[in-house]
Amino acid sequence: MAVVNVEVRSPLSPDEVLRVLTDFSERRAEAWPGVDLDRLVVHELGEDFAEVTEGNATTWERERYEWDRAAGTVTAKTLDSNVWGEGSRWDYRITPVEGGSQVGVRLERYGKNIKGKLIGALLPVAGKKVITDGLRSALKLT
């Protein structure tokens, strides 16, 4: 198992951060460069949940997103993936702060094959920077 924790401050309000995290339209690929539009499939979308397949040629996963606006949380649990196994997930915590939001992210990855285990082994080394940079970039979009 690989775990990465990051904290990012954003000028966006908590509601704006939540919108970026839960926007499954074609804008998702603009906010998250690791998501290819041709691999983005929204299977089900509700008021506070979504089941989505997203990713790129290297890695993809089908996830169940659930969010709670009042609590400021978003969770994405992996249902299927070409590299990640059961228990893999993203947890976001959005806290209002003066001038925007503080966003905490916890990523847990369980490699289900050799490719997943190799990528997972690199996460503690390079994952924090990659996730932090990606999140900072995405949260500048409104």
Identify the residue ranges that each predicted region occupies.
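Beta-strand/loop substructures that line and gate deep hydrophobic ligand-binding cavities in soluble
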Residues: 77-132
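A short, structured loop/turn motif at beta-sheet edges
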Residues: 11-15, 45, 67-72, 93-102
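Short amphipathic alpha-helical signal-transduction/dimerization elements
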Residues: 25, 29, 123, 127-142
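Hydrophobic pocket/interface hotspot
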Residues: 17-21, 65, 76, 103-105
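Short, surface-exposed coil-to-beta transition loops
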Residues: 2-5, 59-64, 85-91
